[in-house]
Curated annotation (Swiss-Prot):
<dbReference type="GO" id="GO:0099634">
    <property type="term" value="C:postsynaptic specialization membrane"/>
</dbReference>
<dbReference type="InterPro" id="IPR036719">
    <property type="entry name" value="Neuro-gated_channel_TM_sf"/>
</dbReference>
<keyword id="KW-0770">Synapse</keyword>
<dbReference type="InterPro" id="IPR036734">
    <property type="entry name" value="Neur_chan_lig-bd_sf"/>
</dbReference>
<feature type="binding site" description="in chain B">
    <location>
        <position position="226"/>
    </location>
    <ligand>
        <name>histamine</name>
    </ligand>
</feature>
<dbReference type="GO" id="GO:0005254">
    <property type="term" value="F:chloride channel activity"/>
</dbReference>
<keyword id="KW-0325">Glycoprotein</keyword>
<dbReference type="GO" id="GO:0043197">
    <property type="term" value="C:dendritic spine"/>
</dbReference>
<keyword id="KW-0675">Receptor</keyword>
<feature type="glycosylation site" description="N-linked (GlcNAc...) asparagine">
    <location>
        <position position="32"/>
    </location>
</feature>
<keyword id="KW-0597">Phosphoprotein</keyword>
<dbReference type="GO" id="GO:1902711">
    <property type="term" value="C:GABA-A receptor complex"/>
</dbReference>
<keyword id="KW-1015">Disulfide bond</keyword>
<feature type="transmembrane region" description="Helical">
    <location>
        <begin position="245"/>
        <end position="266"/>
    </location>
</feature>
<dbReference type="GO" id="GO:0005886">
    <property type="term" value="C:plasma membrane"/>
</dbReference>
<dbReference type="InterPro" id="IPR006028">
    <property type="entry name" value="GABAA/Glycine_rcpt"/>
</dbReference>
<dbReference type="GO" id="GO:0098978">
    <property type="term" value="C:glutamatergic synapse"/>
</dbReference>
Length: 474
């Protein structure tokens, strides 16, 4: 019983296959090629290419499939991308239906010039072409029910308006807009053939700077002054790969910024080394900025990478200005202020010593004369102007006090009074020398700027990086 039913089912299902095989053999048989030729001639005879299928009736439904071969280039400068694809359209034309041969007919690509085809075009196309090696890459396939499958291998460069505010941490949406040029929705309708499976090959695409995160298929109608037109949109969501920019832009900028801090560990009086290092790092950052601007369009807003390079440039430039500040404090403003203070102290000391000598030396036992003191002060000023500012303190050492012995005998009372007077003068000179020493800038005060810079610059730069990456990555 079951065997009989099984054999019956096998006979029912195998009958169409047997018929198809017989027909295929009959078609491929050279003796029956005349039948195929007569069928094609009959279909093309009287066919009017100027009229769409079902002219005057319902609109022609055109289904579309896209098999993406590659995305060759995404250009930020030109705001476009280049796509190579197999573009297929299918519609039904009752004028091309046949029942003599129950098989599909794949015809020569030149037959497409004798049939009606949709006036499809790419709305955001800049430049497109159909491949022609070794012959024009077109396909025409007819089905017995009149369905026509029309395929093309196309390379198109389509416009893609990009928002580069977050470049190179950005995501872009690039679309391919497909539309009918002349036929309105009263004559033609577009739809994605196979719904979500209408576009294939996306997952196989590999781009050097981007990753395809997602894609969407959109069907809509657009209204112009000439009527309503069908439109299909294929939208790619592209995420830029940051690896290239880490190696080519971010890491060099970070290393150059850190290199500019080396000057904080170089001695303050090594002007040639510190200035050369600062200028070199500034020029290197300028070169990186210039190279980056050449690879991007001239846009009116600031990009994320501009913010980072600008921040690095500021840190490098501030490191150069830091040495200018140290140099000015030690070799500029400091010595001028020290010289003025030394002159005031010397003048006051000379005047007071002259008055005291005139009043308290009846026995002609005096300190160094005013002329000798002035000469010694002039010598100290010359030393201060030519050498290290610390050397000015040497002019006021107590050992420079000299006495001139009188030729006349002295009483013990006068000797004691003179000794007390000399002791007072020595003490006063020591105090003057101590005050002058205090006004001289210590090297530790100048080096403190470098010590603070060694901490301040890395901390602020680290904070800048944390804020930058948290903001643009999230």
């Amino acid at each position: 019983m079951w065997r009989v039913r099984k054999r019956g089912y096998f006979g029912i299902w195998s009958f169409p296959l047997i018929i198809a095989a017989v027909c295929a053999q009959s078609v491929n048989d050279p003796s029956n090629m005349s039948l195929v030729k007569e069928t094609v001639d009959r279909l093309l005879k009287g066919y009017d290419i100027r009229l769409r299928p079902d002219f005057g009736g319902p609109p022609v439904a055109v289904g579309m499939n896209i098999d993406i071969a590659s995305i060759d280039m995404v250009s930020e400068v030109n705001m476009d991308y280049t796509l190579t694809m197999y573009f297929q359209q299918a519609w039904r034309d009752k004028r091309l239906s046949y029942n003599v041969i129950p098989l599909n007919l794949t015809l020569d690509n030149r037959v497409a010039d004798q049939l009606w085809v949709p006036d499809t075009y790419f709305l955001n196309d800049k430049k497109s072409f159909v491949h022609g090696v070794t012959v024009k890459n077109r396909m025409i396939r007819l089905h017995p029910d009149g369905t026509v499958l029309y395929g093309l291998r196309i390379t198109t460069t389509a416009a893609c308006m990009m928002d580069l505010r977050r470049y190179p941490l950005d995501e872009q949406n690039c679309t391919l807009e497909i539309e009918s040029y002349g036929y309105t929705t009263d004559d033609i309708e577009f739809y994605w053939r196979g719904d979500d499976n209408a576009v294939t090959g996306v997952t196989k695409i590999e781009l050097p700077q981007f990753s395809i995160v997602d894609y969407k298929l959109i069907t809509k109608k657009v209204v112009f002054s000439t009527g309503s037109y069908p439109r299909l949109s294929l939208s790619f969501k592209l995420k830029r790969n940051i690896g290239y920019f880490i190696l080519q832009t971010y890491m060099p900028s970070i290393l150059i910024t850190i290199l500019s801090w080396v000057s904080f560990w170089i001695n303050y009086d090594a002007s040639a080394a510190r200035v050369a290092l600062g200028i070199t790092t500034v020029l290197t950052m300028t070169t990186i900025n210039t190279h980056l601007r050449e690879t991007l369009p001239k846009i009116p807003y600031v990009k994320a990478i501009d913010m980072y390079l600008m921040g690095c440039f500021v840190f490098v430039f501030m490191a150069l200005l830091e040495y200018a500040l140290v140099n000015y404090i030690f070799f500029g403003r400091g010595p001028q202020r020290q010289k003025k203070a030394a002159e005031k102290a010397a003048n006051a000391n000379n005047e007071k010593m002259r008055l005291d000598v005139n009043k308290m030396d009846p026995h002609e036992n005096i300190l160094l004369s005013t002329l000798e003191i002035k000469n010694e002060m002039a010598t100290s000023e010359a030393v201060m102007g030519l050498g290290d500012p610390r050397s000015t303190m040497l002019a006021y050492d107590a050992s420079s006090i000299q006495y001139r012995k009188a030729g006349l005998p002295r009483h013990s009372f006068g000797r004691n009074a003179l000794e007390r007077h000399v002791a007072q003068k020595k003490s006063r000179l020591r105090r003057r020398a101590s005050q002058l020493k205090i006004t001289i800038p210590d090297l530790t005060d100048v080096n403190a700027i470098d010590r603070w810079s060694r901490i301040f610059f890395p901390v602020v730069f680290s904070f800048f990086n944390i804020v930058y990456w948290l903001y643009y990555v999230n």
